[in-house]
Amino acid sequence: MSSNARPTSVESPLAAQAPTKLVIASRESRLAMWQAEYVRAALQKYYPACDVSILGMTTRGDQILDRSLAKVGGKGLFVKELEVALAEGRADLAVHSLKDVPMELPPGFVLSAILEREDPRDAFVSNDYADLAALPAGAVVGTSSLRREASLRARFPHLVIQPLRGNLDTRLSKLDRGDYAAIILAAAGLKRLGLSERIRAVIAPETSLPAAGQGALGIESRVDRHDVQAWLAPLHHAPTALAVTAERAVSRQLGGSCQVPLAAFAQWTDAGALRLRAFVASPDGRRKLAAEAEATPATPAEAEALGARVAQQMLDGGAHDILATLGADAPPAT
């Protein structure tokens, strides 16, 4: 079984003995704690007699604020300490923003549930400008990801893109004190914290394709905790899970990490198909490549296959050459 797939052979939550006590591991940022509280409320809805508590933790990713994630180790910096708590039995489950979860989990861990997705798009935030098109030449835009940076450089070469680190409140304060003309954030985080009024415009996927898993919450547990997996089953949202499984399959096969300007976004169509789009670019935005495909996956394996198909299209189109220039662990050319 893939370390990124939800187990399929767990007890029915109706058959499993209801939990009496659960501990949720979470980062301590305001957004992370909101997400943990959201999961706690959902669990208490299904298990009202259960004592659900939150173990707040500071991760290495929270401590390193003077360098971009691409330079200090990437996504794993936000989950390692939480996984240690799971391994040691100090927590039963960990709540993550799925886009921050590495494409390959360490042995012994599994994504046991994926919740229904919030808005997956990027958000344009500015005190002075209505949208990206309104920014003048030389305007400084802050972003925390190479993916957004590459997308912006490809479509708005007249803008100056600068790194932006810190939690959500810190990033907004940097904008408010005038460090940036605008910043790009995930729309989901702003909406979850009741900050929708800060969004001047949501950015269409055609302009900035979202990251794999963006807007979705993933709940991680130990692979041997079948009881936890059963208790989490009512929280699992299958349509979201199939979409993000396809996205993560693309990213995993192309070596996706914070060091790679890679986007992957799957969206259900009105006809019931899953449309998967992917985009990779050099950091300066000059070399870029896109691919897409549709399928009607009913299982995680079929969603993985859709992701593999799009990843192969990318490789056939020259993604290997772009990835190689980044020093990424690019798959061999075929």
Swiss-Prot record:
It is an enzyme of class 2 (transferase). The modification S-(dipyrrolylmethanemethyl)cysteine is found at residue 258. It holds the Pfam family Porphobil_deamC. Binds 1 dipyrromethane group covalently. Its cofactor is dipyrromethane. Signal peptide: none annotated. One of its GO terms (biological process) is protoporphyrinogen IX biosynthetic process. NCBIfam families: hemC. The porphobilinogen subunits are added to the dipyrromethane group. This is Porphobilinogen deaminase.
